[in-house]
Amino acid sequence: MSDAHEIEEANAGFYRAFEALDIAEMEHVWAHDEHVRCVHPGWPLLCGWDAVRTSWQTIFENTGEMRFTLSDVTVNMGHDLAWVTCTENILSEVADRVAVTAILATNVFERSSAGWRLIHHHASHIM
């Protein structure tokens, strides 16, 4: 499998975990290091795996459903780093309210002995 295909699969795994609202799947996608970072729309920068994991747990506990259709997907690669940019077209149910929104996202992956792991997710509302 080519590196580009591995990155596409790693990115798809992130969105599968997100849609499943499954913290165990999300744990598998991410590196568990202090250098990981995450910015959810409207949230401050979260630093380190513990803070990032807690944020996903909170989101999953308060979300009834989350469905993604990705568009404008681009994959860029370096030697041991790769990044994916995309538009997340989201249908969600949070606190019994259904919403449809579009979010710009950047996902940065780092190659490790375990494969490509997410080290940075940044998602911002399109204004």
Task: Please annotate each region the language model reported.
Residues M1-E25, H35-M127:
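A beta-strand edge to alpha-helix "cap/lid" segment located at domain peripheries
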Residues A31:
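Helix-to-beta-strand junctions that scaffold the AdoMet/dcAdoMet cofactor pocket
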